[in-house]
């Protein structure tokens, strides 16, 4: 496995809608393994392929080490880490919850976002099998966050234009300072 380079805002690849994967083959599995290694290396709980400069509909998640009140996987046969290819999310309740989220592509930022509390996600797994998972709480939030990346949506897109511009300017300064070292 390899640790891949993370892409940070305002990189244009993060604003693209990702392409579906035709089949989960060995090269896709290698990408999934590398994404998982990259996510762990950067202390993340989720990662989408566009965050490593790959415009494919793939996400990886692992909330097992996060201290959260509720992390509901309501299908007991599912264990972490989760690998989702071509995920399709639908709400199974109209209840939304607002909470702060962070993102590996938006370092040092925490942004409040309202998301569905309960969802159902259909996807291809690591072995190209079609799966359906019902999720609630933080897992549902994390899945929705990562799927946003596949649709070219970033946390800053939930902010007003003024706050969005200020946040992106801050990120540019952080990035510039890192390159100057």
Swiss-Prot record:
Binding note for cofactor: Binds 1 Fe(2+) ion.
Matching InterPro entries: Peptide_deformylase, Peptide_deformylase_sf
Keywords, comma-separated and alphabetical: Hydrolase, Iron, Metal-binding, Protein biosynthesis
CDD domains: Pep_deformylase
GO MF annotation terms: metal ion binding; peptide deformylase activity
Catalysed conversion reaction: N-terminal N-formyl-L-methionyl-[peptide] + H2O = N-terminal L-methionyl-[peptide] + formate
GO terms under biological process: translation
Documented EC number(s): 3.5.1.88
Any Pfam family hit: Pep_deformylase
Cofactor (UniProt): Fe(2+)
Annotated binding of Fe cation, by residue: 103, 145, 149
Major enzyme class: hydrolase
Catalytic site positions: 146
Family (UniProt): Belongs to the polypeptide deformylase family.
Role: Removes the formyl group from the N-terminal Met of newly synthesized proteins. Requires at least a dipeptide for an efficient rate of reaction. N-terminal L-methionine is a prerequisite for activity but the enzyme has broad specificity at other positions.
NCBIfam families for the chain: pept_deformyl, PRK00150.1-3
Protein name: Peptide deformylase
Gene: def
């Amino acid at each position: 496995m390899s640790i891949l380079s993370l892409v940070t805002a305002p990189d244009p690849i993060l604003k693209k809608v990702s392409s579906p994967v035709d089949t989960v083959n060995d090269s896709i599995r290698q990408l999934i393994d590398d994404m998982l290694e990259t996510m762990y290396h950067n202390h993340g709980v989720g990662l989408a392929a566009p965050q490593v400069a790959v415009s494919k509909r793939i996400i990886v998640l692992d909330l097992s080490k996060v201290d959260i009140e509720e992390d509901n996987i309501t299908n007991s046969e599912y264990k972490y880490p989760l690998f989702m290819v071509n995920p399709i999310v639908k709400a199974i309740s109209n209840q939304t919850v607002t909470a702060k989220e962070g993102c590996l592509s938006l370092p040092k930022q925490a942004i409040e976002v309202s998301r569905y509390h309960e969802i159902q996600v259909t996807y291809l797994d690591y072995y190209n099998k079609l799966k359906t998972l019902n999720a609630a709480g933080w897992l549902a939030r994390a899945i929705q966050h990562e799927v946003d990346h596949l649709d070219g949506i970033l946390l800053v897109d939930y902010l007003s234009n003024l706050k969005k511009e200020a946040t992106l300017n801050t990120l540019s300064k952080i990035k510039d300072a890192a390159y100057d070292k």
